[in-house]
Amino acid sequence: MKPQLESLGVYKAGLSEEALKRKFNVEGEFSRLASNENPIGPSPQVYEAIRSQDALNYYPDPEAIQLKASLSEFYQVDSEQILVGAGLDEIIMMISRARLNPKGHILTSEGTFIQYTTHALIEDNEVVSIPLKEGKFDLESFKDKMNDETSIIWICNPNNPTGTYVTETELTGFLESVHEDVMVVLDEAYFEFVLREDYPDGVALLKRFPNLIVLRTFSKAYGLAGLRVGYAITSKAYIDVFNKVKLPFNVTALSLVGAIAALKDQQYLKDYVAHNDKERNKFFEADYKEHLIDSVTNFIFVKTNQPEALFEALIKGGVIARPMPNGVRISIGTRDDNEKVHKVINSFFS
């Protein structure tokens, strides 16, 4: 076995509902607000597309040609610039596997998505983690840490778990400082939720920065977390390399047709994003708003030096959230879900 695996833990998504009920001695139904999922589900067109599939005895299209064609038209990029994977986790793994070797290091932030670090360590690569500044990526400090050993720079924008973002001015200024041999991966898993005018569109920056890789997903805003479909958009040269480490038939037939159907129903997406925006704003109008980091996504981050206590209070209030070292991340749910959250947080800080 690889010796570096000895120090790695197994990723845990949290306890099951039944395990939580036993541990905290609670009954009833939970609001599942731990994984930033879409609480209302995908477009009805997705279910129709999936029900129409009856050739499940055959392997899916290994090249995801139809989905790539749909994404190509949607973003006005060449289909050869697109890589499709079983969620962004697989895309992150492919990029890391293709690019990293023991002689280099990655740059990322301490308080961000853990898979960037996990796959660097699996590839025996050094990880240089830079603290967040006011809950967001500190790109100025990234500049100070870049050197000839830097292989990949990972930027989560908006950031998970804080929900903050770097502006277009901040991002383009940073990209201009990065050597063209260094990959910059811009993880935009939550970009659909951002309604701020100064938020950068990563795909629009690809022509200026050929070393940029943009990641997006159908798991969050489109509500297809159970189907696992993510994708990267970048230069054809990068895609050609990533395809060499891609597993054959990596995305299921049902996932492919579901993603195509979801992409077509943009009105459904807009309606859900509007719902999310309305519900998110209510959190930042609450009496406890000083304990929140300003989020532009489908989740909030509650700052507290007692995250386990808040997590337990939420469980006893019928809400499953995600505890972190310095707070708790809570997905924005339905109106009823969010009322539960408001009640618990108000009580916790009163």
From Swiss-Prot:
Cofactor needs: pyridoxal 5'-phosphate
State the pathway, as annotated in the record. Answer: Amino-acid biosynthesis; L-histidine biosynthesis; L-histidine from 5-phospho-alpha-D-ribose 1-diphosphate: step 7/9
Gene3D superfamilies in the cross-refs: Aspartate Aminotransferase, domain 1, Type I PLP-dependent aspartate aminotransferase-like (Major domain)
Reaction catalyzed: L-histidinol phosphate + 2-oxoglutarate = 3-(imidazol-4-yl)-2-oxopropyl phosphate + L-glutamate
From the UniProt record, give one GO term of the biological process aspect. L-histidine biosynthetic process
Against Pfam families, the record matches this protein to:
Aminotran_1_2
| A Gene Ontology molecular function term of the record | pyridoxal phosphate binding
Keywords for the protein's UniProt record, in alphabetical order? Amino-acid biosynthesis, Aminotransferase, Histidine biosynthesis, Pyridoxal phosphate, Transferase
Q: What class of enzyme is it?
A: transferase
HAMAP family for the chain: HisC_aminotrans_2
Tell me, how does this one assemble?
A: Homodimer.
- This one is known as Histidinol-phosphate aminotransferase
What is the protein's species of origin?
Macrococcus caseolyticus (strain JCSC5402) (Macrococcoides caseolyticum)
